[in-house]
Amino acid sequence: MMSCWFSCAPKNRQAADWNKYDDRLMRAAERGDVEKVSSILAKKGVNPGKLDVEGRSAFHVVASKGNLECLNAILIHGVDITTSDTAGRNALHLAAKYGHALCLQKLLQYNCPTEHVDLQGRTALHDAAMADCPSSIQLLCDHGASVNAKDVDGRTPLVLATQMCRPTICQLLIDRGADINSRDKQNRTALMLGCEYGCKDAVEVLIKNGADVTLLDALGHDSSYYARIGDNLDILTLLKTASENSNKGRELWKKGPSLQQRNLSQMLDEVNTKSNQREHQNIQDLEIENEDLKERLRKIQQEQRILLDKVNGLQLQLNEEVMVADDLESEKEKLKSLLAAKEKQHEESLRTIEALKSRFKYFESDHLGSGSHFRKEDMLLKQGQMYMTDSQCTSTGMPVHMQSRSMLRPLELALPNQASYSENEILKKELEAMRTFCDSAKQDRLKLQNELAHKVAECKALALECERVKEDSDEQIKQLEDALKDVQKRMYESEGKVKQMQTHFLALKEHLTSDAATGNHRLMEELKDQLKDMKVKYEGASAEVGKLRNQIKQNEMLVEEFKRDEGKLMEENKRLQKELSMCELEREKRGRKLTEMEGQLKDLSAKLALSIPAEKFENMKSLLSNELNEKAKKLIDVEREYERSLNETRPLKRELENLKAKLAQHVKPEEHEQLKSRLEQKSGELGKRITELTSKNQTLQKEIEKVCLDNKLLTQQVNNLTTEMKNHYVPLKVSEEMKKSHDVIVDDLNKKLSDVTHKYTEKKLEMEKLLMENASLSKNVSRLETVFIPPERHEKEMMALKSNITELKKQLSELNKKCGEDQEKIYSLMSENNDLKKTMSHQYVPVKTHEEIKTALSSTLDKTNRELVDVKKKCEDINQEFVKIKDENEILKRNLENTQNQVKAEYISLREHEEKMSGLRKSMKKVQDNSAEILAKYKKSQEEIVTLHEEIAAQKRELDTIQECIKLKYAPIISLEECERKFKATEKELKEQLSQQTQKYNTSEEEAKKCKQENDKLKKEILTLQKDLKDKNVHIENSYETERALSRKTEELNRQLKDLLQKYTEAKKEKEKLVEENAKQTSEILAAQTLLQKQHVPLEQVESLKKSLSGTIETLKEELKTKQRCYEKEQQTVTQLRQMLENQKNSSVPLAEHLQVKEAFEKEVGIIKASLREKEEESQNKTEEVSKLQSEIQNTKQALKKLETREVVDLSKYKATKSDLETQISDLNEKLANLNRKYEEVCEEVLHAKKKELSAKDEKELLHFSIEQEIKDQQERCDKSLTTITELQRRIQESAKQIEAKDNKITELLNDVERLKQALNGLSQLTYGSGSPSKRQSQLIDSLQQQVRSLQQQLADADRQHQEVIAIYRTHLLSAAQGHMDEDVQAALLQIIQMRQGLVC
């Protein structure tokens, strides 16, 4: 029975059954009651290490709760310290887990092993590290616990401490010699897990103690990757500082000159070899600018990495959701195991119910025998609470093939000598990587959808299983309730038997007392033995009753537990349904997200196809900025050279002026040639410089245009990035740290924009300067050329230069306009940046809320991890059980395979059968379709044949008619004359019918007139009667009734007359219609006759006329039939009216009788008038008449009083019968008392006889005989009492019948009273004439009504009392007859005795 309940516990702990003392010890341990624990331990067979249903013992409970005194008591008593629970934890594990250092110290004093491992492979030090208890860690380390012990996942206590964010414990473990760089099974270090879970303090401790930052895990990720996943910038900065301190090679790289600087220095040397010192300064400035640009590039790289980390975070979320789905599957499996356990519990409850039933049967069969004391077993077994926990969301990185080199590695400065081919290859690789990423995302989406569908199906199946289990539990509860009802019935029966035994015991006690008085010691001893036996039996019966009650209570507790389980199942079902709905919603959300991601990926791929990669763009940007800086420096150098040349040209100008003055006087050819050669050299040099400057100017213009295009592309990309950040990449609840990073990015962009705009303005200024220098140089050249050129040419050249100057001014104005437009664009970009800042401030969450959420999530993660550990341990235990079940399943599978082989050999599979059946059905359908088509074709052909036959027949008829027409083209006159004769005969018949109908209508009209005349006569008679009645005022009520009846009859007659008139008018209209139709027919006949006389008529017209006339004849016949019906109905109505008139005549009085009555009334009126005239003279006669009337009234009062006395007599009779019944009951009670007295006397006589007799055996026999006789007498008395009860019931029924008769009499009396009232009304009318009824009469009527009401109330009260008494008698007599002597029955008997005494009194 109990072995299946302990299936979850280890096999070694199931040796002993769970006892009541174990239960008490467990409760005392949970309460912390030391005295109770020590008292229970003092008893034999108590083991504090025994496991309960949940797989824990009192020893484990005390260690987990930290009750040091209880633990000390258990250790002193003696217990196996290494005993473990279902999770494989011993007392040391539990004390370390819950942070009870004193209990841990006590256990270590008793040499508890520190290297014991639970089912997860964790030691007590692991639990202490997770519990944040440094004192327990120190104790364990002092007692030789291994600091670097690893669990099943390969995690040390240091790893768990960093994962749980416990920096003090991390430091303590490191001080105790823990390995900082120890790795788990995924090659992750403590630093990686600390970065992942965002534990800044723990990470600082690890970095200070020399944790290696550069280590990689199995997926090739370092600790900075995990810090990016955790979204903690402080940890990132710590890692950067640590990596910078470790990597000193970067400083050398910073100090060494780059290739770009060397190229720039070579360019500067080629441009100008003279200014080496200034160029060195410019080179240093350029190096500084390059370093600034590098820093900016690093920031951009960090931003790109953050974006990539976000993408990776999204992928991790997807992976976590997959893990959650797996956890849901595991939860479902656990639910299935719970359901199986509950089914086992139900089976065991059924077994217990069957055992109870067998016990009850045994008690029923042998309720007098001594009951065996059953050992109490605790049937209430606790279910193991399976904590359904979500599995730990382990962070898995992004696959390596999804990350391109541009994403993973930092950006490098592109060399100017790199070819575009390598850039295109990089772009192609990135596109391929993005495509592979898209494909993998699609595959993941399909997998997720399939998994979700599978999980939804599993959830539905689980819901169905829950419903089935619920129905089973409901049925079992109903069975338990029925069993409880049976048990209660049997309890009541056993209590009755116990009460009988009590009465028997009291009787024996009285006998013993009487024997003690006489002095028979032997009888006393024997009777004492009998008493002892009876006591034993009584105690056994009471013990059995107590056991039954305990079992009933246990069953009730089981039923309550089943109900609780049902409630839990209902809640779990609801929860599963909610989870189902949530899963469906999540599936929809994921589908939407995947569609959005696919759209984003497509857009990104399109943009990537169009746009330049970030590395190339930034390299181009850096190159342009460097070249612009170099060109600015070159322009400065050119300006300086220009100033020098101006300084050199000034003395030359002076010399030229002097030469001009001299030339005006005289010119030497040698000097002229020298000057010419000098000027030509200078002009050649200046021309070279001009060409170089123009070429440089053109290249600068091209570069400026490229820069403008690049700026436009940048603005577009910035806008696209902002829109993407708003819509896709940035969630609504991101930490303030990300906000800071975005602010930094926005500031950098603003700086870049300001730098670009500043450089753009500088370049424009440089362009203007160059143009000005060009103009000045051209002017100088022209001047130098004009020295030896005539003035006309010089003027022309000056005009050309002026025109060039105007053109250049125009160009300058256009450039200024462009600058203004560029400034407006810059302002618009600044406003967009401000808007972006505002949106960032609105849409992002503060740090506090983020940290709070983070702490809450970390705490929930810790809890879930702990619960996961417990669940894993339980799962391993369950797996051990599943191995057995699998073995059994394999045996069953073998049997199944054998049966399947037999089935395959002997039978055909269902699929083949269904396929064959489907093939046959298809063939049948095809055959049916073919047959239907053939039938349809056959029907069509038959229809066509029928139509052809009909057409042939019609053609034959037409041929016959044509032949007849050919034979007889025209009809003969003889046939027409015959037709005329027939028509005339029909017309005569119709005219005769019309004349008969008119006669009938005339007769009906005459009868109606007679009826009207008779009604008028009756009305006149009624009016005369009314006048006579008004004059004489005799029998007013009768006259009114007759008037109403006559008026009703007159109204009915009037209605009938109206109906007859309507019918008469309708008949007239019909008559007119018939006359018109006859006229039409006669006109048609005349026209036909004229036509026949004039010319021969063809046969077709004759036949059409025949048809029309036959149709008219038929219609006329139908109309005649309808009119005959109407006439018959009218005749019926007339007969009814006649009958009504006859009835009125019979009911109404004839004139002669009416006149006689009238004369009699007139005579009476004359007599009354005479008496009234003689009132004054005959007042004495009137007083005598009044006295007579008063005497009559008194007689009526006396009659009423007699009626009342009759009613009182009836009531007295009722009371007398009631008293008779009560006396009879009292007599019966007295007889019962006499019988009891006789019984006592007989008992005394028997005792005297027993005294006389010597032998004890004879006395025993006599006792048995007397007891049997007493039982027989009591049975006879019970029979007599039952007979008396039946007689009483019969009398009660008779009394009820008498009451009904009395009710009938009362109704008759009430009718008599109403008649008397009418008589009094008549008397009052006679005495006082037509006046209102007197006050006395009304008072009498009211008094009579009140008396009648009071009598009715008295009767109702008497009936109620009588019924109450009968009910009381019935209940008490039945209880007394059945032998029940409860307190209620005793109280009822006391009531009966009191009532009897009252009746006797």
Swiss-Prot record:
Gene3D superfamilies: Ankyrin repeat-containing domain. One of its GO terms (biological process) is negative regulation of non-canonical NF-kappaB signal transduction. The modification Phosphoserine is found at S265. It is found in: Nucleus; Cytoplasm; Cytoplasm, Cytoskeleton. Residues 273-361, 423-827, 856-1368 form a coiled coil. There is a cross-link at K1020 (Glycyl lysine isopeptide (Lys-Gly) (interchain with G-Cter in SUMO2)). Its main location: nucleus. Highly expressed in muscle and heart, moderately in liver, kidney and pancreas, and weakly in placenta and lung. GO terms for molecular function: actin binding. SMART domains: ANK (SM00248). ANK repeats lie at residues 25-53, 54-83, 87-116, 120-149, 153-182, 186-215. Induction: Down-regulated in crawling cells. Up-regulated in motility-defective cells. Regulates APAF1 expression and plays an important role in the regulation of stress-induced apoptosis. Promotes apoptosis by regulating three pathways, apoptosome up-regulation, LGALS3/galectin-3 down-regulation and NF-kappa-B inactivation. Regulates the redistribution of APAF1 into the nucleus after proapoptotic stress. Down-regulates the expression of LGALS3 by inhibiting NFKB1. Component of the apoptosome complex, composed of APAF1, pro-caspase-9 and UACA. In the complex, it probably interacts directly with APAF1. Interacts with LGALS3. Interacts with ARF6 and ACTB. Interacts with RAB39A. This is Uveal autoantigen with coiled-coil domains and ankyrin repeats protein. It comes from Bos taurus. The gene is UACA.
